[in-house]
Regions:
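Transmembrane beta-strand segments of Gram-negative outer membrane beta-barrel proteins
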Residues: 5-54, 61-62, 88, 92
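Long, internal scaffold/assembly segments composed of regular secondary structure
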Residues: 247-332
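Residues that define the transmembrane beta-barrel architecture of outer-membrane proteins
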Residues: 10, 54, 58, 66-74, ...
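Residues on the lipid-exposed face of transmembrane beta-strands in outer-membrane beta-barrel proteins
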Residues: 16, 74-80, 90, 136-141, ...
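Transmembrane beta-strands of outer-membrane beta-barrel pores
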Residues: 20-26, 94-98, 102, 156-160, ...
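Outer membrane beta-barrel
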Residues: 84-233
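Transmembrane beta-strands of outer-membrane beta-barrel proteins
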Residues: 12-20, 88-90, 150-154, 211-213, ...
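Outer-membrane beta-barrel channels and translocator barrels
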Residues: 9, 81-85, 144-148, 194, ...
Length: 332
């Protein structure tokens, strides 16, 4: 639902999407996914040795017939177009989940005392119950330089490069993702891609050549399902990991930029893209520091690799009613 409005100097629109959805577990908790020794209400028998290393709290928290999500969410967008080719865009989203924190009360043998009797830490429970965030918030200006149209955009925005929109690890590495949102029924892709504050500039150069560059002012990371949630597969990642002894070191904000050149030859349906990018990882790598070599006491820390370089090429073309694209990326 939405509406548009217009004045002598302003054209605008405001659109809202309200969605309700639910997810239900249809199978019982599998013995081969549970460690021996769970406790609490209706605790199942586990088939795995306690030394298995399997994190089973997310599996224990929801039994057959339980709703692991029952939510109401909204996405709201404001678009304003002003004189002098100025555009303003704001998008925000919120979600309230009424079922994700209603768990079985079964605890794994190694669930820390700091985790509540519902198998969720305070951080994980807060993240599951309600979340509101600002996504896009940018202003853009169009102007002419040397007979070519230039567009400059400043603020929270998404950069879409390459041909892969749904698979991470390719050319499209500028953006962080909310993987918890992607697992939610009824999600739109624009709700799961997390914008970052950037300055981007794009322009045509003539002869079918277009160039775009950006500089990112602040690093942001991808978000994973909270520890103990239905889609959680490890106690080490996601909100609540601190209760299990895992810390995290963020990447620095500076040093991320990218440059792309797109070219479509005359009398050709094939469009080519060439890319170079410097970025910090959005997903972490684990570093374990040994504190005491005699007892093997360790301090596991998730770290985000910095100053990674990526070089890529892409191509796309129409074949009948189909659009076909391919890409190749290289990281030294």
């Amino acid at each position: 639902m939405g509406f548009t409005f217009e004045t002598e100097t302003l054209n605008g629109s405001f659109d809202s999407t309200i969605t309700a959805g639910m997810g239900l577990r249809t199978e019982s908790r599998g013995c081969n996914l549970i460690n021996q020794g769970p406790t609490g209400h209706n605790a199942p028998s586990g088939c795995l040795a306690q030394s298995s290393g399997v994190a089973d709290q997310g599996d224990l928290n929801y039994d057959r017939g339980d709703m692991f999500t029952n939510y109401l969410k909204g996405t709201h967008e404001l678009l304003l177009k002003m004189p002098e080719d100025i555009t303003f865009m704001a998008r925000g989203t919120w979600i309230r989940d009424f079922a994700a924190t209603d768990t079985t009360g079964t605890l794994s043998f190694n669930t820390p005392e700091s985790v509540g009797s519902n198998g969720l830490s305070d951080d994980a429970r807060d993240d599951l119950a309600f979340k509101a965030r600002l996504l896009d918030l940018w202003v853009s200006k169009g102007f002419d330089v040397g007979g070519q149209r230039v567009r400059a955009r400043l603020g929270n925005q998404v950069i879409n490069w390459g041909e892969s929109l749904f698979v991470a690890g390719g050319i499209n590495n500028t953006n962080a993702y909310d993987y918890q949102a992607l697992a939610r029924p009824g999600v739109q892709l624009k709700e799961a891609v997390l914008p970052a504050p950037m300055l981007s500039v794009a322009s045509g150069l003539g002869s079918g050549v277009n160039v775009e560059a950006y500089y990112q002012f602040r690093w942001n990371k991808s978000e994973l399902p909270p520890v103990g949630s239905y889609w959680s597969t490890t106690n080490a990642l996601g909100e609540g990991r601190g209760d299990y002894g895992f810390s995290e070191k963020d990447a620095r904000d500076s040093g991320q930029w990218g440059l792309s050149l797109r070219w479509q030859p005359e009398d050709s349906d094939v469009a080519y893209g060439f890319y170079v990018m410097r970025y910090h990882d959005k997903l972490p790598s684990l570093r374990v520091a040994i504190l005491d070599p005699n007892t093997f006491a360790a301090a596991p820390t998730w770290e985000y690799q910095e100053d990674r370089m990526m070089y890529g090429i892409s191509a796309n073309m129409p074949i009948g009613d189909w659009a076909v694209g391919t890409e190749l990326s290289y990281r030294p």
